[in-house]
Amino acid sequence: MKHLPKHLRPRWRYLAVGLESWPDADIDRRAFQRELWFAAQNLIGDAGSAALDGSVLHFRFEDGDGEAVIRARRGEVDALRAVLATLSTVDGHPLGVVVRGVSGTVRACEEKYIRGPQEGTEERTVAFAGADRPAVVRNDRVTVELSGGPVGATALDIRDN
């Protein structure tokens, strides 16, 4: 089978996406891809999601932080951004999604926008809401365990013990 001439080949753009959730969230590539496709179908329909493509090429998620590289056709980057804005949960875990940048090649996308593994997490006991509570510290973010579930905080909200 012959290759298509260059002017007939599909042109792609690659979005680097940052992911953030609670430290105990377990999100894998398959679940993220499924939620992305469902969100695209719900927002722009079957024909629009087929034109968009939205394939996850690179995925890493651990300890509540992660990143992904998602492929879209050249004219569909804004539609993919809109679809990503509608993602709020994956497998029942809340998820924050931030588009770090757009590039024309996978290599440039990974070199410019994908940072690799974040610094490690640390478990500490902190003073929060008038009591000592267990917490997970990641860079400048703190996740405090309360009886109703985890609560996000910053270094200004807590006091180390």
From Swiss-Prot:
Record family assignment: Belongs to the eukaryotic/archaeal RNase P protein component 2 family.
Top-rank lineage group of the source organism: Archaea
NAD as UniProt keyword: no
Keywords: Cytoplasm, Endonuclease, Hydrolase, Nuclease, tRNA processing
Protein name per its UniProtKB record: Ribonuclease P protein component 2
A Gene Ontology molecular function term of the record: ribonuclease P activity
GO CC, alphabetical: cytoplasm; ribonuclease P complex
Cysteines joined through disulfide linkages: none
One annotated GO biological process: tRNA 5'-leader removal
